[in-house]
A protein has these predicted regions:
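N-terminal low-complexity, acidic/polar interaction/targeting segments
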Residues: 1-191
Length: 191
């Protein structure tokens, strides 16, 4: 069990995914500074109820994030780029005096990523087209034969509901995740 500072957001971060944030609240600016000084990570958890500013109820599963780049923006904004690392189960949370949430987390066991099955090649082709239109992925190697990587990027880039994205994060098997993505896309492709 570990403790992580938490960043509740209206999004789901998958392992190996990229997340660009504009940070302005003092509690998160301080958290980012601490993470960068100590090479520590923070946890990204999707908001079930509430808002990003103020109190929020989160889902019980999230992903640790490592800051890989940052820049100062006008108006006291801090821009950061983080990459998703390990998924976790959020056991308990507490709110610090400055409003920052800290969670006790249990790291989820690593699931080896199989090669992409031939049946999922159309999903890899779709992802290739999507990634080409997303600037932050322009300089990222795209292992389109890696089932977990393909599934993770599709979860992030496709316009699925937050609830479905969260459920896909909680689906541990990459091939099962791809099957669920294909099923979710099916009505759109035939309609």
């Amino acid at each position: 069990m570990s403790e992580l500072p938490l960043f509740p957001l209206q999004t789901v971060l998958m392992p190996d995914g990229l997340l660009a944030l504009r940070v302005f609240e003092p509690r998160y600016v301080d958290m980012v500074a601490r993470c960068m000084r100590g090479a520590n990570r923070f946890g990204v958890v999707a908001i079930r109820e509430g808002a990003e500013v103020g109190a929020a109820t989160t889902y019980d599963y999230g992903t640790s994030a490592e800051i890989v780049d940052w820049h100062q923006e006008p108006g006291s904004l801090l821009g950061i780029l983080a990459v998703g690392r390990e998924p976790f189960h959020l056991l308990t949370t507490r709110r610090e005096q400055d409003g920052l949430y800290v969670g006790s987390v249990e790291w989820l066991e690593h699931v080896p990523s199989p090669k992409l099955a031939p049946a999922h090649e159309p999903l890899a082709a779709l992802l290739k087209r999507l990634v080409e239109s997303v600037p932050m992925y322009q300089n990222v190697a795209a292992p389109l034969d890696d089932a977990a990587w393909v599934a993770g990027r599709l979860v992030e880039l496709l316009p699925f509901s937050l609830e479905l994205k969260q459920s896909l994060l909680e689906t541990r098997d990459p091939l099962a995740r791809l099957e669920r993505i294909a099923a979710a896309l099916e009505p759109r492709q035939t309609g």
